[in-house]
Structure formats: structure tokens, C-alpha cells
Amino acid sequence: TRWAFTDYTQFSPEHQGFSPLPEKRQVLGVATSGELLGLGVWAEYAWNSMERTEDFYGLVVGSNYTFDFQTYVMLEYYRNTLGKTDSDEYTLNDWMRFIASEQKALSRDQVYFLAQHPLTDFIEAGISSIYSISDNSVVIAPTLEYSFAQNMQITAYLNFNIGEEGSVYSDMQGNGGLIRARVYF
């Protein structure tokens, strides 16, 4: 397949924007999922063989469980060797590629946690967090979801960034929130 990063440090009049860096990529992946001791478990691995840039891989290992009292928890580890091992290594290109969704994560190693619990038949509260092992930063996002009809819901969430300046979840980025309405059809 064709893969293209963008060089955000070079402007290209020919492309009327930043310089694209296209190359061929071959991906070999494997995934598995199942149950182990009552826990849902899964793993995914993808090796990316690149034409010019350094090869990299992504690995996800996770587990989930729903307690008898209806609380759902999930824990997932994500490793992406395209990411960096320390926030001092992040470049402008890394940040821009992350923002433009050209790469999935800035940091090499992350842990994701999610917990959800139904408060009523129509309201569910939750909290999720992503911890960057690579730069020791974290984002925490409490959520509240209201399903007022079979195919309609309103979700509100906040996010709190906690980390040193320059880290992927630096508190210098500020905190925020969002209210989203969804209709399924």
C-alpha cells in the first residue's frame, strides 16, 4: 500500500502545502481474542515494513471484565515503535503527524483504562484515562451518557491533562469538555 507522511518543516509550492513523503508499506498483522479465567482478552500485532523509513510495529494487549453489579472495566497496553521513548525526542513533525492522524501516538508506550457503570436504565457514568509510560503524563476523562430513546443519546465528558511541559498530555494544553448528541439509524 502507499503510505505518506508529511514533512511539516518544508513547504512545497508544487503541492501547495507541506511536502508529502510517500513510500510503499507492507503490513503483516495478527490478532486474537478470547476468554481467560472469565476475563475477555485480546492481542493485536502489526509489523510495518517501510520502503525508505525505519520499519516499526504496533502491539495492543488488553483485557476486560463486567462485574455482577454491572460495572465494566477495561485495561489495554499499546506499544508503537513509531512513537518516541521520551518527550525530549518529540519534534514538530511528530506533533503535527499526531494531530493530522498520520501516526496514532506520540509516545511509544501507553496504558488505557476505562470503567463504566449504569446509574439508571438510561444514564451511565464512566471514567477513562490514558497514561503515557514514555513521558509520564496522563489524561483523565470522566463521562456521563444519557440514552433517552432507543437510538438517541447525549454524552458529556471532560478531560484533564496532567503532565510536564512538552509531554503528550501536558497540563499546558489545558483541560476541556464536550457534549455530543448521537442519533443512530
Predicted segments — roles?
Residues 113-117, 146, 153, 157-158, ...:
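Outer-membrane beta-barrel "beta-signal"
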Residues 1, 38-42, 70-75, 121-125, ...:
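Repeated loop/turn-to-beta-strand initiation elements of outer-membrane beta-barrel proteins
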Residues 1-60:
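Surface-exposed beta-loop-beta
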Residues 33-37, 64-68, 116-118, 145-147, ...:
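Structural signature of outer-membrane beta-barrel channels/translocons
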